[in-house]
């Protein structure tokens, strides 16, 4: 068994943060680390070592394509999560998401990501598409995500937005969706963050299906 530092930048004074998570010593598969012809700007960073077979900037011009390979219980377990740091006193961003090729159990969206996180995403369940908001907190060492709201949609293109407010230690994140990129609807509860320098992250995972 190996130990990997994955919470080294979570400086939280309110409680002790576990510095190590266990992971299996899984050999790297052929091609995982090979250059795939795509070049990201230096402002981007991966949450884990990426699998270069599963992302691309060249397969579809003007788009970042993310694929899944393993079933994950939470976003924290996913390898190809890519992000930028937030900045204060306020910041926000939105993404346009093409969900036409998503499969049963897939979840793709936009997260305010740190030790405690939340995200707005499209989820495929029972053949239907839903916009969902999901929170995660590991208080009392209970590690699980819980859904706070869902809205069924039929569209294959949606816009997802996260706004962050750090003024006067407010530290809140707000989640929105749009079907046309102009008219926005707030979804889910406001997320109370516990860390200033979290990430705005693009996520794509496959959850266990019933």
How should these model regions be labeled?
Residues 201-209:
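Residue-level detector of conserved catalytic or cofactor/ligand-binding positions
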Residues 123-145:
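Trp/Tyr-centric glycan-recognition "aromatic platform" motifs on solvent-exposed beta-strand/loop surfaces
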Residues 57-75, 130-135:
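Short carbohydrate-recognition loop motifs
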Residues 138-159:
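Short, aromatic/His-centered strand-loop micro-motif at the edge of beta-sheets
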Residues 4-46:
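Extracellular carbohydrate-recognition regions
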Residues 35, 95, 159-189:
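Carbohydrate-binding surfaces in secreted/extracellular proteins
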Residues 72-128:
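Secretory/extracellular carbohydrate-interaction modules
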Residues 40-67:
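Extracellular glycan-recognition surfaces and repeat-rich motifs
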